[in-house]
Swiss-Prot record:
GO terms for biological process, alphabetical: alginic acid biosynthetic process; extracellular matrix assembly; hyaluronan biosynthetic process; polysaccharide biosynthetic process
Protein name (record): Mannuronan synthase
Organism of derivation: Pseudomonas aeruginosa (strain ATCC 15692 / DSM 22644 / CIP 104116 / JCM 14847 / LMG 12228 / 1C / PRS 101 / PAO1)
Family matches, as PANTHER family: HYALURONAN SYNTHASE (PTHR22913), MANNURONAN SYNTHASE (PTHR22913:SF12)
Lineage: Bacteria, Pseudomonadati, Pseudomonadota, Gammaproteobacteria, Pseudomonadales
UniProt catalytic activity: [(1->4)-beta-D-mannuronosyl](n) + GDP-alpha-D-mannuronate = [(1->4)-beta-D-mannuronosyl](n+1) + GDP + H(+)
Pathway the protein acts in: Glycan biosynthesis; alginate biosynthesis
Length: 494
């Protein structure tokens, strides 16, 4: 009780400080800014971001429509199916590597509990590297004593990355010869399942015969400081709305590695297994290279290529235990952004080549926006800085006031997602916009550079010395050229 009171008081103080800063900024800007007849009127500063705000607004409206109207209708239809929607068999596959014993115990305890409580014939498939994990799982298994319809299968894998772990697990499931009504849940080694998540996810495959995979809502517990914790929670709130928006078209853009559920005939398809295990890109400048990370994007692309739909179940929740890769928030967030945005951009260009007939026009528009957002996100800040240097500091003050007000509104809208909001969200939103855009630009010209945050595995391509030199220097040259053109164009406009 006391902890809740202290947290509430701290958050109230944070909101008061943020609102006070907005008032100070409002007092600092010229009075003409608030004059609707003035050329400096505050809303003009938002014109440069009209594309970004319109895309965000469309996602929000679509997300709320799905969450509060469409999904409840679908859920009623699923409940009407009753036991007819039950799968013939459920496989719960967990991949674990270099995760602490406490987290591993929490994860497997939740998985075994779900296998018992679901009532379905279930096989828990443990894709593991270390013997200590096997000993821990066997101990939990004996303690929880599941019924005969629940079985345990261990798959020992080399510690060469998650892709290999998934492929070994998929092949192990193939040896069980699952039928067309069987489903497979792929669960990360740091994901704790909420009560009832299996029963909430598996019936959807009967309602939607063409859905090949679906993913779930995420909440998190962060093993880090306050800002790092809020940063992750904000990300999951934004993810929830975007997932709901894309689920309206049955085109959810990623099969989240933390927990996604597939038809068994998908994960046992040799093409799908190859796509996940040996995904690669043929780049015009960087050559051919394998994907080290981003198995969630590879599985999504494979589903699209094979002709399946994707879906999102917002009331099926999982809880992830986040371990930041660095103690410093700046370093940790940059490292995570580098991996996430790299995975995103590596899939983007080839996803667009699937075309509107396969993806739909809205999905094509979203994929296009992912490519241009790295520049549009920086537009307002760069214009404000140039205008303040060329004309008056008032332009920068107006811009900062605009950012404060709009991020406050965005934060309040995020509360409608069902995720908790905090006073740090407006600042973190802007941090994500600017730093995220810079990271995207950097990684866009270096798509071949990949590494894990949990293990020291890096992509080794065995290139000749000249090819390595050419890739490095051409990446620098293209980054500098693109940034120079961007600034030069804005200088001619301002």
């Amino acid at each position: 009780m006391m902890e809740t009171y202290k947290r509430g008081l701290a958050e109230a103080t944070g909101w008061l400080v943020f609102l006070s800063l907005l008032m100070v900024l409002a007092l600092a800007v010229p009075k003409t800014v608030f004059d609707a007849d003035s050329k400096d009127f505050i809303l003009l500063i938002g014109a440069v971001g009209i594309w970004r705000y319109s895309m965000g607004g469309v996602h929000f409206l679509r997300g709320m429509l799905f969450l509060h109207v469409v999904y409840p209708y679908y859920r009623r239809r699923v409940r009407q199916l009753g036991s007819a929607a039950d799968p013939s068999h459920v496989f719960l596959m967990v991949t674990s590597f270099r995760i602490d014993a406490l987290t591993t115990a929490m994860v497997y305890r939740s998985v075994i509990r779900e296998a018992i409580d679901s009532g379905y014939p279930t096989t828990v498939v443990c894709s593991i590297v270390e013997m200590s994990d096997e000993v821990l799982v066997r101990s939990l298994w004996e303690k929880m004593n599941p019924p005969d319809r629940v079985s345990l299968d261990f798959v020992r894998i080399p510690g060469t990355g998650k892709r290999d772990g998934l492929a070994y697990g998929f092949r192990a499931i193939s040896r069980h010869l699952p039928d067309d009504d069987a489903v497979v849940a792929v669960i990360d080694g740091d994901t704790v399942l909420d009560h009832g998540v299996v029963k909430k996810t598996v019936p959807w495959f009967k309602l939607f015969p063409n859905v090949g995979g679906l993913t779930t809502n995420e909440f998190c517990e962060v093993q880090g400081g306050y800002v790092m914790s809020e940063w992750h929670k904000l990300r999951f709130a934004q993810r929830h709305i975007n997932m709901c928006s894309m689920a309206l078209s049955k085109r959810v853009l990623t099969m989240t590695g933390r927990m996604s559920v597939f038809r068994a005939r998908v994960v046992t398809n040799p093409e799908f297994i190859t796509d996940v295990e040996n995904d690669h890109l043929e780049h015009w400048r960087l050559g051919r290279f394998k994907f080290l990370t981003g198995d969630d994007k590879s599985s999504w692309f494979s589903l699209m290529r094979l002709g399946y739909d994707t879906f999102y179940v917002p009331d099926a929740a999982i809880n992830t235990v986040e371990h930041p890769p660095e103690k410093s928030f700046i370093k940790a967030s940059r490292k995570l952004m580098y991996r996430w945005y790299g995975n995103n951009l590596r899939q983007n260009s080839r996803a667009l080549k699937l075309g509107a007939r396969r993806l739909g026009w809205f999905t094509m528009l979203v994929l296009f926006d992912q490519r241009v957002s790295m520049w549009t996100s920086l537009l307002g800040l760069v214009v404000a800085i140039l205008a303040s240097l060329k004309y008056s500091i008032a332009f920068l003050l107006v811009y900062l006031l605009w950012i404060g007000l709009t991020r406050l509104v965005l934060t309040l809208l995020l509360s409608l997602s069902g995720h908790r909001i905090g006073p740090a969200y407006p600042l973190i939103l802007y941090y994500n916009q600017i730093v995220g855009a810079l990271v995207k630009i950097y990684v866009f010209f270096r798509l071949d550079r990949q590494s894990w945050t949990r293990q020291p595995t890096k992509l080794e391509r065995g290139l000749a010395s000249f090819q390595r030199w050419f890739n490095a220097w051409s990446s620098r040259a293209m980054t500098f050229s693109a940034a120079s053109i961007f600034v030069a164009v804005l200088l001619t406009i301002v």
